[in-house]
Amino acid sequence: MAEVVIVEQIFDPPLTDEEHGRIGKLIDRCAGMRNATWMRSYLSADRRRMFCEFEAPDAQSVREAYRTAGVPFQGVWSAELYKR
């Protein structure tokens, strides 16, 4: 069963639309090879922090995808979704 996996990233300088598109393509390709699927991202208003949500077998699969893509990250962890 797939887990919810969260990735935290910090950008300095702030993330541009061009860079977002470039890294998104790299991560999609590498994540797909590990049965991980990007679901959504939350980018801070100043474009310096982003949290991405994946459905994946485990957090390690997503870490490996980011490392293979050469995209830095601050942290990757499995999470539980709580909503109203």
Residue ranges and their predicted role:
Residues 1-39, 44-48, 82-84:
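Short S/T/G/P-rich N-terminal loop/turn motif that feeds into the first structured element of a domain
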Residues 55-84:
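An amphipathic, aromatic/His-enriched active-site/gating alpha helix that lines ligand/cofactor pockets
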